[in-house]
């Protein structure tokens, strides 16, 4: 194979800037997919991806392109997720490429996530082609967007293709730019020791785990003995090939190619994205750079509403885990919610997507507790424990300090919302770092703040303040000590473990008051009075009372029969005291959802 005719590239963009639509047009123009098989967002395989208009799972496809210089080229398009939760996957798929197409919406301009992904591409030394999309919109301002890209990112836009991916206008210019500007895989050597980067994996019920790979050097054939360098696990290649986007089997793959390989691997946990495949007989000395083990950043408890569906829920998690190695879970029991699982996710979007897939694809009705981050708890006996479940936090006297994860957040916003967004960040314990100018009307705010404050309703407030115009991205910068306490909720004197949360001391009173008030509204009245208390240790910081129903036991008495009336009321009072001692309070599902929505 002539390596000079190969082009490996990704498309990067902010959500809704037209990445998947451009991919569709490229598939059409190169006749990769027949017109009758074409559908919108073809590379987005899940219904959730199409409905939300986002890419979650990576996809790759090989295309053939006949260029203007009468040459035939092979393009490998590696589709990438655009959301901050999946940054590591984006970085690995970019590492499989030599170039990237940066798609920017002509009416929106440069957004926070655009910057995040561009910097990843720059870190991978990729050739970046800026493409300005949606030029057919009435609100498009091409010159302004060109200026933004040149000023903020430093890319020359004088020859940028100006396109409409929706109508197909000028998309041919993008294909020609790929040929002219993106380099071929020049370092690809066939006779060197095998090195292949795993940039994605999924489970197939016939083949087992299928790994999406980019061969950096060496060759790979069916029957070869291979080794995964992070675990030293050895396997035999059973089949390999390329995607067009259909699965096409081949006998071998060469250096510089992008394809897939299966080796009878049973579970996806055995394969790590970013790992290097090498040969058992002639192994490489060093793995490829950039591999790291992914750790969940956000945890929550998920429980089936119907307790009889526990086994179905467990099987559904096992099936989803086959195609998503970043999901972690372990069994958990709650006094309030019964049997369920403590699940770990890469971020809030990842959590929502997994929950939605469980409910949709497996017909389950689920309830989730408030999300929590991983805290580092330093005990007085010098031990350090990592904790993601607030209910398991030790007593205050055993703790010397608690550290929580901090992130650096970049918010791209129109200038008019800056004051309100700065207030929001300060209310979320943000530390101001910098403000960068995009143009006359847009700025980038840079803050450092606790991750726990971002997962707690930050996104909704940001969108509400900016009327949807602001966008943000964040990255973990490490752990810092904070004044944190565990707040519990007691109903009728009994602690409800599913309501426990770790909060900053500064917010404990407001959140306690807001939550007790919300629960008072949502929990139905009982036949006895129910106190709703927010507590820190033994101290009650907020209390509301759900009044009892008052049954009129005296309705059939004569007005003059005062002693009988008094006797009946005393009896009712005794009954209520007894009922309160043995009575349990039914908590409706809405109450568990309310904990996610309480306002500061």
Swiss-Prot record:
Gene3D superfamilies linked: 3.30.70.240, Elongation factor 4, C-terminal domain, Elongation Factor G (Translational Gtpase), domain 3, P-loop containing nucleotide triphosphate hydrolases, Translation factors
GO MF, any single term: translation elongation factor activity
Record function comment: Required for accurate and efficient protein synthesis under certain stress conditions. May act as a fidelity factor of the translation reaction, by catalyzing a one-codon backward translocation of tRNAs on improperly translocated ribosomes. Back-translocation proceeds from a post-translocation (POST) complex to a pre-translocation (PRE) complex, thus giving elongation factor G a second chance to translocate the tRNAs correctly. Binds to ribosomes in a GTP-dependent manner.
Catalytic activity: GTP + H2O = GDP + phosphate + H(+)
Annotated HAMAP family: LepA
Organism expressing this protein natively: Mycoplasma mycoides subsp. mycoides SC (strain CCUG 32753 / NCTC 10114 / PG1)
Similarity remark: Belongs to the TRAFAC class translation factor GTPase superfamily. Classic translation factor GTPase family. LepA subfamily.
GO CC terms: plasma membrane
GO biological process: positive regulation of translation
EC number: 3.6.5.n1
Entry-linked NCBIfam families: lepA (TIGR01393), small_GTP (TIGR00231)
Protein name: Elongation factor 4
Localisation: Cell membrane
Binding positions (GTP): 16-21, 133-136
PANTHER family for this protein: TRANSLATION FACTOR GUF1 HOMOLOG, CHLOROPLASTIC, TRANSLATION FACTOR GUF1-RELATED
CDD domains documented for this protein: EF4_II, EF4_III, LepA, lepA_C
Keywords, comma-separated and alphabetical: Cell membrane, GTP-binding, Hydrolase, Membrane, Nucleotide-binding, Protein biosynthesis
Membrane topology: Peripheral membrane protein
């Amino acid at each position: 194979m002539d390596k000079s005719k190969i082009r490996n590239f990704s498309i990067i963009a902010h959500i809704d800037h037209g990445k998947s639509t451009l991919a569709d047009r490229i598939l059409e123009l190169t006749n990769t997919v027949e017109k009758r098989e074409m559908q919108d967002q073809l590379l987005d395989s899940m219904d959730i991806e199409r409905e939300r208009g986002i890419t979650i799972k990576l996809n790759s496809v090989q295309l053939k392109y006949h260029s203007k210089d009468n040459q035939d080229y092979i393009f490998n398009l590696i589709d990438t997720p655009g959301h901050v939760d999946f940054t590591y996957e984006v970085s690995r798929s970019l590492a499989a490429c030599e170039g990237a197409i940066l798609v920017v919406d002509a009416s929106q301009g440069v957004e926070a996530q655009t910057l995040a992904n561009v910097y990843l591409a720059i870190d991978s030394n990729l050739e970046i082609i800026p493409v300005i999309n949606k030029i057919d919109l009435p609100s498009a301002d091409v010159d302004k967007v060109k200026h933004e890209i040149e000023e903020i990112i430093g890319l020359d836009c004088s020859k940028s293709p100006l396109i409409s991916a929706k109508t197909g206008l000028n998309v041919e210019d993008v294909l020609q730019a790929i040929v002219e500007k993106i380099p071929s895989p020049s370092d690809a050597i066939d006779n060197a020791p095998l090195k292949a980067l795993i940039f994605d994996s999924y489970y197939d019920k016939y083949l087992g785990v299928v790994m999406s790979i980019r061969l950096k050097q060496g060759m790979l054939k069916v029957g070869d003995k291979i080794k995964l360098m992070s675990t030293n696990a050895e396997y035999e290649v059973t089949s390999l090939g390329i995607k067009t986007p259909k699965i096409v089997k081949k006998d071998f793959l060469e250096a510089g190619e992008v394809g897939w390989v299966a080796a009878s691997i049973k579970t996806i946990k055995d394969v790590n994205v970013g790992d290097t495949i090498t040969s058992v007989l002639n192994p490489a000395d060093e793995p490829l750079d950039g591999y790291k083990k992914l750790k969940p950043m956000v945890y929550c408890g998920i429980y089936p509403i119907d307790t009889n569906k526990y086994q179905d829920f467990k099987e559904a998690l096992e099936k989803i885990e086959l195609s998503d190695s970043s999901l972690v879970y372990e069994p958990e029991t709650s006094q309030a919610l019964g049997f369920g699982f403590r699940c770990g996710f890469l971020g809030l979007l990842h959590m929502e997507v997994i929950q939605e897939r469980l409910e949709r694809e497996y017909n389950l009705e689920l309830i989730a507790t408030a999300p929590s981050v991983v805290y580092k708890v330093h005990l007085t006996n010098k031990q350090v424990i990592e904790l993601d479940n607030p209910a398991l936090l030790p007593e205050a006297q055993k703790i010397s300090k608690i550290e929580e994860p901090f992130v650096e957040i970049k918010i791209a916003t129109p200038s008019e919302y800056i004051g309100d967004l700065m207030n929001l960040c300060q209310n979320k314990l943000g530390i101001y770092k910098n403000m960068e100018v995009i143009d006359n009307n847009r700025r980038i705010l840079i803050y450092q703040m606790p991750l726990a404050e971002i997962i707690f309703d930050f996104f909704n407030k940001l969108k509400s303040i900016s009327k949807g115009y602001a966008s943000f991205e964040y990255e973990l910068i490490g752990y810092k000590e904070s004044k944190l306490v565990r707040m519990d909720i007691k109903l009728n004197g009994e602690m409800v473990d599913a309501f426990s949360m770790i909060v900053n001391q500064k917010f404990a009173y407001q959140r306690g008051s807001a939550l007790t008030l919300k629960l008072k509204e949502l929990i139905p009245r009982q036949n006895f009075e129910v106190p709703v208390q927010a507590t820190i240790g033994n101290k009650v910081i907020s209390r509301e009372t759900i009044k009892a129903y008052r049954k009129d036991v005296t309705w059939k008495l004569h007005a003059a029969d005062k002693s009988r009336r008094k006797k009946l009321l005393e009896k009712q009072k005794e009954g209520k005291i007894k009922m309160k001692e043995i009575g349990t309070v039914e908590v409706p599902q809405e109450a568990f959802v309310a904990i996610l929505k309480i306002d500061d």
